[in-house]
């Protein structure tokens, strides 16, 4: 049978459920599909289907993730849900499932727990822009006062991690009762989705951002000049435009004298295109893999940053032994390995850590030996002798 065509008539937003184990993330995800399916906006997926998510590999790291899609009146959503806590950590850090916003699921019976906090911190560190709270299992709490207290606690917690705790919508739901078809709880799922529609902003499309292309390869074409090839990460570029070459050495400006794709000339290259840019007055030696071509002034190179890092377990092909501050691995940034040093670590509770074990999720400070174009929210890998031993995301630029 012919495959269904993906209709692009509604804006597309990526979201996911986050929160403590057993607070009902997967049940809520199933409830959203069952309620929306009644309006023809989703395909029903039950708990077992979502929970039995297949393993995926992202940069050599095994992650279990369920992908569910549905739509509301105004939007099309791709929703990710992970069975295990470690899967969330890996997912959010590697950006395997990029989230434009998240539904934080918290059980009214328990209130915020350890992983509730950890997921809020992760969301902050990896740059999830907006959250909506689903206060789940509200059918099991008769006392309105308890619910109010839990809501206050969640708001305080969100504010302590620099989310707008007072303004984030908290919707009282019961995933289980909604799946069982109880009308009042089905209506609550609709209310939750209205809150998601209203509070999670539509992501800026890649093509509207300033131009950036990481250089993968460089050729010189006799009589025409030097061509840098790569995939345009964002924005667009036209023949005749001025661009800047940033990273590794001093930044310099040049003009694009041609855009080529599959050996044909293009008027302009767009985000997602693999293409070659012909650069005026640039020798092959002036440019190398790891540099980026950008809209002038839109990005500056840096050497020092903070990152949230997941260190691979030995079963995932990571190290077998711990490492300490002063450790010098390679940081694989966009298209190249750059040597650097990890100067300090901090645990989730903010305490200093002397030693990092395989399987840990930590905040670290890294320093590179040469400046490269790094920016907040950017993903990187930590490698040693060509194998990946960690995955990270830049949470803050220091210098």
Curated annotation (Swiss-Prot):
Q: Which GO terms describe its cellular component?
A: cytosol
Q: Where in the cell is it found?
A: Cytoplasm
* Region of interest (G3), residue spans: 81-84
List every stretch annotated G2. 60-64
| Binding residues for Mg(2+) | 26
Which keywords appear in this protein's UniProt record, sorted alphabetically? Cytoplasm, Elongation factor, GTP-binding, Hydrolase, Magnesium, Metal-binding, Nucleotide-binding, Protein biosynthesis
Q: Which PROSITE patterns match?
A: G_TR_1, G_TR_2
- Give one Pfam family: GTP_EFTU_D3
- Please classify the protein's predominant subcellular localization into one broad category: cytoplasm
Q: Where is this region: G4?
A: 136-139
At the top of the EC hierarchy, this enzyme's class is: hydrolase
SUPFAM superfamilies in UniProt: EF-Tu/eEF-1alpha/eIF2-gamma C-terminal domain, P-loop containing nucleoside triphosphate hydrolases, Translation proteins
Catalyses which reaction(s): GTP + H2O = GDP + phosphate + H(+)
Q: Quaternary form?
A: Monomer.
Q: What is this protein called?
A: Elongation factor Tu
